């Protein structure tokens, strides 16, 4: 593939300043850093996992990083291009709460069917528990399964064992700890 995206075109910058919360200067800075870390202009899943391992040395972030990678890789080609990277970074770092919750919903909805099942929720919660390592937990949240049960008890209003985007959004807003656990912060 060679030096894909080594020079950022002005029309790409214009599109990204419109589509993201970054300025042209910030986009250029991020692009420079992205190319430094990914000289061919592509971030692979293994590279993505390696980055996560730097931030979570006491746990195993591999599973979680792979799940996040899937959401970053919008076109599902097995690599994150700069535009995909900056769009996801814009939402996760500067998006409003609804944007962040929609992004998180996409993370949890592994099969992209518009619902989060208990199994999908367990998959993510288990990955988070593996990533952060042994952390003190309350009795009702000391295993991934207990955490999932608690989340579904709070969010699954129609008791169909799956969460819609609306149930997920409302449930997350009703319990600030869930938003915190998603590392999404506030507005």
UniProtKB/Swiss-Prot annotation:
Residues linked to a lipid group, N-myristoyl glycine type: 2
Similarity comment: family membership: Belongs to the recoverin family.
Mutation effect (residue 178 to M): In RNA edited version
Domain of life: Eukaryota
Residues that bind Ca(2+) 1: 73, 75, 77, 79, 84
Residues annotated as binding Ca(2+) 2: 109, 111, 113, 115, 120
SMART domains xref list: EFh (SM00054)
Keyword vocabulary terms for this entry: Calcium, Cytoplasm, Lipoprotein, Metal-binding, Myristate, Repeat
Keyword presence, Metal-binding: yes
One of the GO BP terms on file: regulation of neurotransmitter secretion
Quaternary structure note: Interacts with ric8a in a Ca(2+)-independent manner.
Residue ranges of domain EF-hand in the record: 29-54, 60-95, 96-131, 143-178
Binding annotation for Ca(2+) 3: 156, 158, 160, 162, 167
Impact upon substituting residue 120 to A: Does not affect interaction with ric8a
A GO cellular component annotation in the UniProt record: synaptic vesicle
Molecular-function annotations in GO: calcium ion binding; calcium sensitive guanylate cyclase activator activity
Name of the protein in question: Frequenin-2
PROSITE patterns: EF_HAND_1 (PS00018), EF_HAND_2 (PS50222)
Protein's organism: Drosophila melanogaster
Compartments it resides in: Cytoplasm
């Amino acid at each position: 593939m060679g030096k894909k995206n080594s020079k950022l075109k002005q029309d790409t910058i214009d599109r990204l300043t419109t589509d993201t919360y970054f300025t042209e200067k910030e986009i250029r800075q991020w692009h420079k850093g992205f190319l430094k870390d990914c000289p061919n202009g592509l971030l692979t899943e293994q590279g993505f996992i390696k980055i996560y391992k730097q931030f979570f040395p006491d746990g195993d972030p591999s599973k979680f990083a792979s799940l996040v990678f899937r959401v970053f890789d919008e076109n599902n080609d097995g690599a994150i291009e700069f535009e995909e990277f900056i769009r996801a970074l814009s939402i996760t770092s500067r998006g409003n709460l609804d944007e962040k919750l929609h992004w998180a919903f996409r993370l949890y909805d592994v099969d992209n069917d518009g619902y989060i099942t208990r199994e999908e929720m367990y998959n993510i919660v288990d990955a988070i528990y593996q990533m952060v390592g042994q952390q003190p937990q309350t009795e009702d949240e000391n295993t991934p399964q207990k955490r999932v049960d608690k989340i579904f008890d709070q969010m699954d209003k129609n008791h169909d064992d799956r969460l819609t985007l609306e149930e997920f959004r409302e449930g997350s807003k009703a319990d600030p700890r869930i938003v915190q656990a998603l590392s999404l912060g506030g507005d």
